[in-house]
């Protein structure tokens, strides 16, 4: 089990390649499609079956022979053609896995079969440094922002508020000193006895400007951090992994576009992990069972 797991991790993601395919069939000429490359997966998507220009006006039946799910040979009729009735047939992406044989069951031909040859090439595995970077990036995205970590960025706003409060206090102190200097000058000047009352009033004004105005600033201090805490305490929503049905829909869309899915279970599991970022074995197993039905 450990060796198979290491092999799956060492395999890179599959990169599909598409090539043109075409062959000619005659009464005594069949076409055999074999692949000696065992490292990559091959699949043929047949598109059209067409009678050649020199074909007779007779019935032509095109037959394909391949292996079924249990590995037993089976034969399937692909198209029935006749020059005066139906000279060409569109198969619309009839996918077949090699090895297989195409032949004329009846008719003299020539008949031309065209389609696409799909090859799933394995990309080179990433280096250890790149794997570590991806793991660190995934771990950072999965961790939601906690309340304790969100308190640290609030120090800078508090410092800036304290600096503003200190500047306001300094301005208030300067204003108080100016008022006191004015009061001293008024006291020194020869005035009547009732002149003492304005001095007391001025002292009260100075107290109001100095001492009474200071408590108003902490109120603003207590209000602003609360709103900032509420904003910082809200954790970031982590990315929700795709559900089983969403992954099936994406795979079906890629199949409809002409891409092929891996035939072997280890490669299929690696394909799901790399392309859809899921590690749930139950989901991978369910997708593998669904892939068998395609």
From Swiss-Prot:
One GO cellular component, as annotated: nucleus
Alphabetical keyword list: Chaperone, Cytoplasm, Nucleus, Phosphoprotein, RNA-binding
Annotated protein name in UniProt: Nucleophosmin
A GO term for molecular function: chromatin binding
Function according to Swiss-Prot or TrEMBL: Acts as a chaperonin for the core histones H3, H2B and H4. Associated with nucleolar ribonucleoprotein structures and bind single-stranded nucleic acids. It may function in the assembly and/or transport of ribosome. May stimulate endonuclease activity on apurinic/apyrimidinic (AP) double-stranded DNA. May inhibit endonuclease activity on AP single-stranded RNA.
Site (Interaction between pentamers): 57, 82
Gene (UniProt): NPM1
Record note on quaternary structure: Decamer formed by two pentameric rings associated in a head-to-head fashion.
InterPro entries assigned: NPM1_C (IPR032569), Nucleoplasmin (IPR004301), Nucleoplasmin_core_dom (IPR024057), Nucleoplasmin_core_dom_sf (IPR036824)
Domain of life: Eukaryota
Ranges of biased composition (kind: Acidic residues): 121-133, 161-186
Sequence motif Nuclear localization signal, residues: 153-158, 190-196
Pfam families xref list: NPM1-C, Nucleoplasmin
Family: Belongs to the nucleoplasmin family.
